[in-house]
């Protein structure tokens, strides 16, 4: 039987990057329905955010991510890559951004969203 890592509970962390506020959340989610419910909850809680980027990996094979309006490949994929690199399963990560008025550029977005997932 193959072993795999799962989060032991929910987590939250915040940081500021060039005046943009990032809030990272991680959740244990055992089904795709649970992952989508958590995403809905975050979108309702942070309804006024500029972006709610997410990625999830469910052990049964469901893997999804979204840039939520950020330039393609600069937000959801870096979040997913952090989860994959850490070999996590049954996990949903949502990184919320409140735009601070300064454009971060593609590289800055990748670094910021990856940091939010860590």
Where are these regions (language model features)?
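Conserved interaction-surface patches within small, structured recognition/assembly domains
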Residues: 68-102
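Glycine-rich loops and low-complexity Gly/Arg-rich segments
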Residues: 49-53, 79-82, 117-118
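C-terminal regulatory domains involved in ligand/effector binding and gene-expression control
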Residues: 1-73
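Glycine- and Gly-Pro-enriched alpha-helical subdomains that act as flexible
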Residues: 92-96, 102-118
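Signal for well-folded cores of large energy- and translation-related assemblies
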Residues: 43, 83-88, 114, 118
């Amino acid at each position: 039987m193959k072993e795999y890592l799962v989060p032991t509970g929910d987590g939250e962390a915040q940081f500021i990057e060039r005046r943009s506020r990032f809030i990272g959340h991680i959740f244990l989610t055992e089904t795709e329905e649970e992952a989508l419910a958590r995403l809905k909850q975050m979108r309702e809680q942070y309804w006024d955010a500029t972006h709610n980027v997410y990625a999830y990996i469910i052990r049964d094979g469901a893997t999804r991510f979204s840039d939520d309006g950020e330039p393609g490949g600069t937000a959801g994929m870096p979040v997913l890559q952090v989860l994959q690199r850490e070999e996590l399963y049954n996990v949903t990560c949502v990184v919320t951004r409140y735009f601070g008025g300064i454009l971060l550029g593609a590289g800055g977005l990748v670094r910021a969203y990856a940091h939010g997932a860590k």
